[in-house]
């Protein structure tokens, strides 16, 4: 199925690209989220008419994400207290939701879907570098200190 992308999508293309994707991906993800429209003749003409407006919107989103990234990078360290055993092993784990709430409490709004934990949830106390993906092109890192709660 051919679609016109209305946003930059990793491993697929950028704004205005006409790409072939599987029909389920287009119908269930790209089109409902407003990231693409079907590549019909009418939609191609509509896209060309709105191209400048869409490019301005994408540039605005990128600038907002870069501003948020500067705020996240400006944070010294985020401290998260959790119950832990004697050897520093946590009772339970710290996931993306907990980290996002801690960063938000520190003063920068971050959604849990933006927090990247490639090794999975944190299960030990210590210092960790956490990556936050604020936009498809904008990443920020933050130092997270996990300490044992009293």
From Swiss-Prot:
Source species, domain of life: Bacteria
Record-level GO BP terms: translation
Taxonomic placement: Bacteria, Pseudomonadati, Pseudomonadota, Gammaproteobacteria, Vibrionales
Protein name: Large ribosomal subunit protein bL9
GO cellular component: ribonucleoprotein complex; ribosome
Family, as annotated: Belongs to the bacterial ribosomal protein bL9 family.
SUPFAM superfamilies assigned: L9 N-domain-like, Ribosomal protein L9 C-domain
A single MF term (Gene Ontology): rRNA binding
HAMAP family according to UniProt: Ribosomal_bL9
Species the sequence originates in: Vibrio campbellii (strain ATCC BAA-1116)
PANTHER family, alphabetized: 50S RIBOSOMAL PROTEIN L9
Function noted in UniProt: Binds to the 23S rRNA.
Keywords, sorted A to Z: Ribonucleoprotein, Ribosomal protein, RNA-binding, rRNA-binding
């Amino acid at each position: 199925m051919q679609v016109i992308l209305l946003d930059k999508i990793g491993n697929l293309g950028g704004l205005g690209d006409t790409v072939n994707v599987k029909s389920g991906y287009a119908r269930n993800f790209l089109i409902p989220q407003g990231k693409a429209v079907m590549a019909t003749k009418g939609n191609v003409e509509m896209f060309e008419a709105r191209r400048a407006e869409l490019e301005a919107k994408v540039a605005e989103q990128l600038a907002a994400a870069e501003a948020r990234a500067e705020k996240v990078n400006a944070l010294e360290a985020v401290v998260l207290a959790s119950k832990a055993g004697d050897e520093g092993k946590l009772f339970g784990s710290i996931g993306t939701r907990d980290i996002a709430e801690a960063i938000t409490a520190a003063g920068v709004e971050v959604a849990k879907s933006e927090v990247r934990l490639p090794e999975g949830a944190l299960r030990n106390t210590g210092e960790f570098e956490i990556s936050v993906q604020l936009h498809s092109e904008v990443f920020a890192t933050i130092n997270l200190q996990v300490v044992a709660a009293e």
